[in-house]
Amino acid sequence: VDLTYKLHAPSLETVFNMIPESVLKRQELTAKGEVTLEGTLKGLYGKQQMPEATLHVSINQASAKYADLPYGIDDLTAEFSGYVDFMRHKPSYADLKIFRFKGAHTDILADGKVEDLLGDPDITFHTRSEIDLTALAKTFPLQEGVSIGGRVGADFRLHCRLSTIQKQDWGRVRLKGKLDMQDMFLRDTKKNFEFTSQAALRFIGEDNLAAHMNIRKASLRNAAISANL
C-alpha cells in the first residue's frame, strides 16, 4: 500500500457538519478560514501485516457564527499531526502543536503530545485558558437538555504515563499550575448527568505531586455515581 490522501475544506462549516447531530443541532452557520486534512498509508497489508499511517490536520485563523446566537468563534487555529505503526517497529505518537480558540469571552491556548501511543502512552499537556462556559452555551446550538455555565481558569502543565492514572499512582504525576472553577456546571438531563464545582486548585509537581485545594462545593451525579464535597 502506498496511498496519499488530502481533504481541503473551505471553512469550519464543513467540519461542524461532521459533528453528530446528537451533539450539535443543525443550524445556519457562517464560517471563514481554511481546514486541511492530509496523510499517508504506506507499507505491507495482509496476514499479520499493517501499513504505517500518518495524519496532519491544520486549521488556519478560522471563524464561525451560528445564526440567532449572540456569540461566535472569532479565531480558531490548530495544528495536529500523528503517526501510527501498527507493527510497532517505530514509536507511534500524536502531537497537538497548537490549539487556539478565541471568542465568547473565552481564550484557550493549549498544546500537547502523546508518545508511545500503542504502548504505555507518555502524555504531556499544557494549557493557559480563560473559559466562560455561560457565553459558550450561547455560541453553539446545544441539544435540548444539555446546559453549561460558569467560568474556568486554567494554567498548568501535566506529564505522566496513562498507566499512572489508571493505577491512581498520583505520586508519579507531574502536574504544576492552577485550576479555578467558579459556579461551574455541566448538565445533561436526558442522560441524568450533572457536575457542579466551585473550587480553586494549586499544583506543585516537580518530582512528586503536591496540591493545595480550596473546594467550596463539588458534586457529581449520574446513573451510576452520586458524590458531594
Language model features with spans:
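Short beta-strand segments that buttress and anchor functional surface loops
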Residues: 96-103, 214-220
